[in-house]
Amino acid sequence: MNFQLKNFLILKTLKTFYIEYYKVLIYYLINSIKNYLGDKLYLYYKKNKYTIYILSDFLFFKTTNLTSNITDTVQEFNSKILIFLPLKIKNLKNNKYKIIYYLLGEIPKYTIEKNLIINGLKKTFISKLMFNYIGIFFNKFIKNNNNILYAKIIFNDKFIINIVLEENKCYCIFNNYKYDLICFLYLLGISMQDIFIFSRYNKSFYLKKLLLTLPSLNINNIINYNIFKYLSFFFNLSFKLNTYYIFNKVLNKNNSLYSYIKNFSNSNNLIALDFINILDILLDIKYNKKNITDLDLLEYRSIFTLGNYFTNQYSFYLKKFSNILHNDIFKCIKNLEKYKLNTNSFKSKLYFNLKEYLTVNPLVQYLEQINSFSEIIHKNRVTNYNSKLKQNLQIRNINLNQLGSLCLIDTTEGINCGLVISFTKNIKIEKRNNFQFPYLPVLNIKTKNFITFINSFLQQTYIVLFNNYYLRKNKLFNFFNLSLNKNSFKLKNISIQNMIYIKPMDMFSFAENLIPFIFYNDPARVLMGAKMQSQIVPILKNKRSIIITGYEKNLLNSTNLILKAYQEGIVVYVSSYKIIIRDLYNRKITYFLDKYKRSNHFTILHSKPNVWQGERIFCGQILTSTQDILFSEYIGGNNLLVSYGNFFGYNFEDAIVLNKKIIYSQLFTSLHFKVYEIIFNSLNKFSFEISTINLPKKSFYSKRNLDFFGIIKEGSKVLNNDILVSKIFITNINISLLPLYNLIYILFGKEIKNIKDKSILVSFGNSGRIVKTELFSYSSKIKSYLGYYLKCRVYICKQRLLSVGDKLCGRYGNKGIIAYILPSNDLPYTNTGIIPDIISDSLGIPSRMNIGQLFENLFGLSCYFLNKRLCISNTFNLPKVYIKTILYNYINNIKEKSGNLWIYNSYSPGKILLRDGRQGYKLSEPSFLGISKYSKLIHMIKDKIHYRTIGPYTELMQQPVKGRNKKGGQRFGEMEIWAIEAYGSSYNLRELLNYKSDDIIARTSLLSNLDNNIILDNITTTESFRTLIREIHSMNLNIEAFSSIDQLEGKILPININF
């Protein structure tokens, strides 16, 4: 028998946030109801006395129970949880009681996949790093060229004490009150003699000078009754030495350093003598004996989850409207007694709906569902943004205490760079929402295999090793290695104690661990490669990559997108939509599969069974495979034979030349959904919309795919301008046609109606196959308010082949636009007839410093001929001599085993001589050839190209406005321009850079020239081109433009450009 037991109280992973959402939320909600609403309420009504007991411990929750199959289709309903507060009403006159449920509000349902379903759309909550505003913190600032030290004691959000130390004085700040520290200590029962007795600086000249500047300490001199009244509310003030507590303990792991008594961590109270020790620590910092508190440590931060967000909102709501809620409860009970209602539930007038807050909150984001991996990455993001802290460069920078907890590379681009980051792959979260990460202890110059967890505060007490040490010939260097000690890199002796080793793969997130040879790439390109992993489109024919990192299978443990067995058992039934397993207790467990569902980005979500009938299943075993998960391994592309070199300029910069064989074999064909929604309206009895097959003035061919009700049939193929749903609008005739109406009614006995055809047609470029049709009926409230009574939704699935303008990418930040597609017989080939699949420019490798793709090409080529797969761990960080030897041995091994002598060239190892496909001659220089993994990105040409008849331009630069919603113009990126330049389409470039840009004169005359069939005028110099010329002139470079040769004199005429 195989069971799994998880302890959610000690450690919790990111997948257990939904448990915290329900358990912690209910716990805090019950406490907030007790604090703000109380336990009892009293009501007098018609000479009757009622006692209302608020049963907050018995909160009643009711859910809508929408399944995951419906949430993708029904957008009018929310998957929500209703919160009912039980009220026990007791009549003291006859001692009868009744229990009613008071509807307090609703919260959205939080699924086990960490999804929020709002209006039928899947969203997710981005966690937030919040500063712990409880503790004692030391810092300094500069004022008038003087260092001013201060200690901030934070008890809660409302009460904060600042102890400020300047050159000649030391004072306290209590919110808005400023008071001398020695006078404050005198109010706590500490005299000057006690300060000299208990302070460590009793012989210091600075402390004596500080005390002598004060006036004589007596009650009449130091008492300010306003301050005394304010402080007596928080402290137990006394004019004798107070050794008892004056306030609750400040919960902080570092407080044992600041407390006067040594067992402060075991004590629950703060005593008055601790202020003397705080003053001593300020003097230690002044004399450079101690350092200030580093507030950037992760130990001072905790994770702010969705449950914390809702508890704050509900506590604010109950606190603000507690009196109004009491009156509302009284009115509900009066109506209950007045009208003798038998209902057992009432709805609050201040019905608290958190859906409004979630739609505005920037932390609740539209879920990225381009592929399975993008969803995992989006849910593991965390933001470092806090409105109470300054957004300076120090917050955005990488802190050394983040090693193992937060990824060092993965972050967003643009203005949020450094503010939105990702968790590492093996992070654990404590019960109090603090971080823990794994490490390996180092004993006797060897790393042990057992893994333990440590937090960032205890990390500073250890010496952290990063990379494995290599044996050298000189034994003196074998005992030293680069390490991290107290936020600085040093060379340390390995034989010393208190050393830990952090694996390199534990310092990165999920995306970086899928990149082999990561240490041979530029970090900026690694970030780009990690971002493109979440932009890969699921394709029909996936293949497992030859070079892997070994983390492709471990990634599936962090996702709930695939079905896993809950118990051990035997598979009883398997079909395309469900799997039935009989467990060891003779129970049947049914697992339902997702079939052809659309994601948030209109890509396909499809599951297939991985097991067969009669197979024995163990607990946690993977049961299904999705569109990009195959053989329990994440797959996002295909292996292609890549040639690096120049091909007649068609692969200019990052442009790509593609073999037409790739399109015929449909290696990168993807499926996409187009959804049409049709609403039928009913204004009144005489004006309504219906669907029927009896459409007027329509041929039989146009209605060939419609059923009896005029709705398209599932599985039919539709083309442009085909009818999807027939829709006619019926109204009464006009008053002017009333005599004709009466005549026809008398002759034929039929009424005449005005019929208008409003059928929905397939828009241009959206032809495909009908996957499914759905019909929804509206509720009575929506029907009466909006007039809608029926909605029809049609799903069209269409295939997208590779075309010119699509974007392909590798795993190392290498990406490019397809500029030219050639048949196989025009491409170069080897002596054995092997033709490359794509040709890429070789200049992008040294300029981007991503050497890892060259290693993948060579290792992939060798594994292809040897029929093997190679696992490259992220700890693979060998010197260049080692990896060069391994590569040459692999290539030489292919040459001996396969018999292909052309693979290994001793004069240029790794390069292969090719022949021209058009003429058959050998090329003058050898070309680099290898096998690498390429993927198709979602930036496809069909989504980029759009048109407009007329639209706005910016007033300042006269460029087309950005965005389709603003009717913006066509915008081309950097890579798209490179592809156009590589293709040699000069007229398109002229149109983009002049007519569609800020050439106002040419733009105004373009329309009249096209209408009158006149030759286009000569274009003028645009402002963007003039800006480019000025930037070139600033580098002491000159540009001159020349026209064609003068036919009379045979001279080249220059063109004058007015700058």
UniProtKB/Swiss-Prot annotation:
It is an enzyme of class 2 (transferase). In plastids the minimal PEP RNA polymerase catalytic core is composed of four subunits: alpha, beta, beta', and beta''. When a (nuclear-encoded) sigma factor is associated with the core the holoenzyme is formed, which can initiate transcription (Potential). The keyword Transferase applies. The keyword rRNA processing does not apply. One of its GO terms (biological process) is DNA-templated transcription. One of its GO terms (molecular function) is DNA-directed RNA polymerase activity. It is found in: Plastid, Apicoplast. Keywords: Apicoplast, DNA-directed RNA polymerase, Nucleotidyltransferase, Plastid, Transcription, Transferase. Gene3D superfamilies: 2.40.50.100, 2.40.50.150, 3.90.1100.10, DNA-directed RNA polymerase, subunit 2, domain 6, RNA polymerase alpha subunit dimerisation domain. Its EC number is 2.7.7.6. It comes from Eimeria tenella (Coccidian parasite). It catalyses: RNA(n) + a ribonucleoside 5'-triphosphate = RNA(n+1) + diphosphate. Belongs to the RNA polymerase beta chain family. This is DNA-directed RNA polymerase subunit beta. DNA-dependent RNA polymerase catalyzes the transcription of DNA into RNA using the four ribonucleoside triphosphates as substrates.
